[in-house]
Design a protein with these regions (language model features):
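Non-catalytic C-terminal accessory modules of carbohydrate-active enzymes
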Residues: 325-465
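The feature captures the catalytic groove of carbohydrate-active enzymes
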Residues: 46-47, 52-58, 102-130, 145, ...
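Acidic/polar, glycine-enriched structural segments that form the non-catalytic walls/loops
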Residues: 5-59, 137, 145-166, 227-229, ...
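Active-site core of glycosidic bond-cleaving carbohydrate-active enzymes
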Residues: 18, 22, 26-29, 58-93, ...
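Active-site acid/base region of carbohydrate-active enzymes
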Residues: 14-34, 88-101, 139-210, 238-241, ...
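Amphipathic, soluble alpha-helical interaction motifs
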Residues: 71, 134-137, 141, 167, ...
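Helix-terminus loop motifs that line ligand-binding clefts
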Residues: 76-149, 154-184, 305-314, 322-349
């Protein structure tokens, strides 16, 4: 249907997405404009940053910034990402029980909405691990070695995975025995909000949560990969072991056979309950059994009331687990949602389209750039001048069986052209190659080839030919 599957070139270096699906094209254009309106180039005391908090606070908080970071890279906001993550890393301190500042404003101060003193401040305990995971993902996208070796980052990673865990009683075996009153100080304003063991903030007597456990898993898994890249193999193995302990705890104690999903909260009266905390269990890959992923997704989809913050995660999540039509519906309708101006929304839609629908996933640790289209309907989609590593790439998909790739970076790249389906062959510029096979998280077969693409070169791959 799509003939030669040609990748047309965009002559300048402006990021541009185009598609025969005008709904996706319109959503990307809206999200790109909205997200870029939140970006600041360095004119403020805090340095380069983008808004990642409630609008009009002129600030960025740990959860929002971590989630928005890949969308920001897609928009070319690398300087902002590094500066913001470094601000979080550099402000970790013993006086805050190894927390950092939850939210930092453009004047380079802890945001007054969340901070009075080191004894009296708001803090969600997931946050340290969320930032570690974000820094790993930023390294994978950019190849920036500073996320691995910078002294302030390494100090933050090490303290978060050791002293922080000890101080707040956050080991897996402590999840069902810890007190909500750990490290409670005499702060008059924030009280027990100095150390909320969840990203769900409306629950009072909660001692631990599934979303915290999922985030801790993600943080330790990322820490393990960071140490591996630094050739610290013993530390990497230990961190991976700790990550797996969180996963096993989640599976052993939090899974409900009756509900076929995870409980979300553990109360101080020794009981479980359910709520909106499952997003981060999936976001951080804390579940590896396809049946349990499916049960969790289905439970989430049955829930009718979600805040816009959670919804901003859903396109990337649903594409990851093969629910492409549900992801597509959100992308098409988000422009009509209430509170769509919340910064996470536009950044999340950008990631959902580029990393979800187009399946573009750079991996500096493996030296590869993966593409895996999940287009709904018979459409083409193309992105030009996408910032990756040390330069730009362009990618086009024609339906879900033909992809083209142009390398505009300064060095040759390995492109893994992947397609859903069990194909015997994939053609590369008309030459037939034996397809390699792997499975996704749900056990679905993916066929792929790996192509070395030199500087300035373009290649086209088509499945089933």
């Amino acid at each position: 249907m799509f003939g030669a599957c040609l990748l047309s070139s965009c002559s300048d270096q402006t990021l541009k997405l185009s598609s025969s699906d005008k709904s996706i094209e319109a959503t990307f254009a809206w999200a790109q404009g909205m997200a870029q309106s939140y970006a600041h180039e360095g004119e403020d005391p805090v340095g380069p940053w983008y808004e990642a908090a409630l609008p009009e606070r002129y600030a960025f908080c740990m959860r929002d910034a971590s989630h928005q970071s890949i969308g920001a890279e897609i928009l070319g906001l690398s300087a902002q990402n590094f500066n913001m993550m470094q601000k979080f890393a550099s402000n970790i301190s013993e006086s805050k029980d190894w927390c950092t500042y939850w939210e930092i404003d453009k004047w380079n101060n802890p945001c007054k909405a969340d901070y009075v003193s080191d004894n009296d401040f708001w803090y969600n305990l997931n946050a340290n691990f969320d930032v570690i995971d974000a820094c790993w993902r930023l390294y994978e996208w950019t190849g920036d070695q500073r996320y691995l070796a910078n002294e302030e980052f390494r100090r933050f990673y090490d303290l978060s995975c050791n002293e922080y865990v000890e101080s707040w009683e956050l080991k897996p075996e402590q999840m069902l025995t810890r007190s909500r009153k750990v490290n409670r100080k005499d702060g008059e304003r924030f009280g027990l909000c100095r150390g909320i063991p969840s990203y769900v903030e409306s629950v009072g007597d909660m001692n631990s949560s599934a979303d915290f456990i999922g985030t801790a898993y993600g943080g330790f898994a990322a820490y393990s990969k960071i140490l591996e890249q630094c050739d610290e193999m013993e530390g990497s193995a230990l961190a991976a072991e700790k990550a797996e302990a969180y996963r096993q705890h989640l599976d052993k104690y939090w899974w409900s056979e009756e509900e076929q999903a995870y409980h979300t909260f553990w109360w101080n009266n020794g009981t479980f309950s359910d709520g909106e905390g499952l997003t981060h269990v999936l976001w951080f890959h804390a579940v590896n059994a396809p049946s349990r992923i499916r049960g969790t997704v289905e439970k989430m989809m049955k829930r009718k009331e979600w805040n816009i913050e959670n919804i901003s995660y859903f396109p990337a999540l649903w594409y990851r687990y093969g629910y492409s039509r549900e992801a597509y519906e959100i992308l098409c309708n988000i422009v009509h949602a209430e509170r769509k101006e919340y910064p996470e929304v536009s950044f999340g839609m950008i990631e959902g389209i580029v990393c979800g629908c187009m399946g573009i996933q750079p991996s500096a640790s493996s030296g590869k750039i993966v593409t895996l289209p999940q287009i709904v309907g018979e459409h083409w989609i193309q992105i030009d001048n996408l910032p990756v590593y040390d330069g730009l790439i362009s990618v086009r998909h024609d339906s879900n069986t033909c992809s083209s790739f142009t390398n505009k970076t300064g060095h040759k790249k390995t492109w893994q052209a992947a397609f859903y389906g069990d194909y015997e062959h994939i053609t590369v510029d008309g030459k037939q190659h034996q397809a390699l096979k792997r499975q996704d998280a749900m056990g679905k077969t993916i066929s792929y080839v790996e192509v070395t693409v030199g500087k300035g070169q373009s290649f086209r791959c088509e499945a089933g030919c």
